[in-house]
Amino acid sequence: MKTGLRLALSSILCVAAHAHAVEILPDENYHDMQVYRPTGDVKEVVYLLADHGTQEAAITRLGERLARESTLVVRIDSAKLLADLQNLKANCVDLGSDFEGQSHYLQARYQLPTYHPPYFVGIGNGAALTYALLAQAPTSTFAGVLSLDFCPEVQLRTPLCRGDDLRTAKHAATGTTELLPLTRSHTRWVVQPDESGLRCDARATRSFVSRLPASNLITVRSARTTATDPAGPAAFEAIGQLLSHPVPGSKPATSSLADLPLIEVLPQGVGTDTFAVLLSGDGGWTGLDKDVAAALAARGVAVVGWDSLRYFWKARTPDELASDANRLIAHYSQQWQKPHVMLLGYSQGANVLPFLVNRLSGDARGKVSLVAMTGLGLQADFEFHFANWVGASAKSLAILPETARLGSPKAICIYGREDPESSCMQLDPKRVQAIALPGGHHFNGDYGKVAETILQAAALRR
């Protein structure tokens, strides 16, 4: 069960604060969230989880300084959040999922021209919470996480959901929830351990950090800790480390496709005569999308990832989608010298795929060897709305009439046997082959099996 931490943006109260306006967003879960908005374009979105009342003036300076650097900053009282979670009536707390949804809602509310996977900065109590949400969310859901004065424990009665890779243990002596190290490389994490030993055993913290995968970890040390001065040199050294790297999954595109949010995943070993275009789910290029692409690349298939969250951040039409696909297919067919392409889609990406295929140019459609729809629903949306996470919007288009028009090329529909919203079994078997796999909409996390199913259907040539 999710914690249901959603924005209640019924009103916005603005108060003047030095060089930037601080907007107070009333919320039933977060109390009053403070939003520092830059005067110009937003380059990054940062959630700042810190206790109110602790170095308040310094935390305010931190928010203002980040806003001057074109960062939209959302300040949340981590102490109040933690207190509310103590009384939560739920099986477990899923901060990763909740903050992902909240970020979508917030950025849509402010009508940012493109979606920015958020960064998180946690101080004190917020440091442990930011580590937890990083581990719970699929890789690249967030741009990066910074935990300042980090201790690997949190006072919480309700268990934390495992999510993607969060492991915990209950401390027998104190009753606190002990956070355990990640088991594999994950979203970028910058950490400044609590070396003072005032909040936790500094040796335990150092041991925790030493057991983490080094590929996504940077340890920042300073004689002056962030607990002493949250807006001082130590904090900004760490924040600089966090923001100095590109957002995971982002890749400079060629000039002809610079307007499309694409990610190239190059093949390993002997390549095939076919490349794949994979339209992601509405959460963006993460989770299943990344893992399936990696599995295909390991088998010699070059993949062009197409980030649905960023692409549909503004309203699109089926014709516009197909026109962009024509450009993409023509470009990569020539650049990679591959005559065939597989068109793949997951969740929202699968929902729009029949509309795309039916509107392709004759030349592009002639190159398509396989259409694979994974986690197909009943309605397709061509613009992101936060309400889409709950159900289809009023502008949704019915999918079944489009799938009824599919003929050549070969089409398959992959679904989880436990997914109640799948429409695969409603499709005409003469046009689309339905293939069932164990699990629900996320296939029990066995994304390698999804990739293998696609490869078996494709019968690729090398």
PLM region spans:
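Primarily recognizes the serine-hydrolase "nucleophile elbow" in alpha/beta-hydrolase
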Residues: 109-174, 331, 340-394, 402
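Alpha/beta-hydrolase active-site loop
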Residues: 89-112, 315-336, 351-355
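Short beta-to-alpha linker loops that shape the active-site pocket of alpha/beta-hydrolase fold enzymes
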Residues: 72, 77-82, 151, 302, ...
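N-terminal cap/lid segment of alpha/beta-hydrolase-fold proteins
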Residues: 20-41, 228-271
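Catalytic histidine neighborhood in serine/cysteine hydrolases
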Residues: 74, 210-229, 302-305, 429-444
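The feature captures the conserved acid-bearing segment of alpha/beta-hydrolase catalytic domains
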Residues: 37, 152-211, 381-435, 439
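Cap/lid segment of the alpha/beta-hydrolase catalytic domain
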Residues: 79-94, 282-284, 307-320
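Short, surface-exposed "cap/lid" segments of acyl-processing enzymes
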Residues: 38-70, 77, 266-301, 305-308
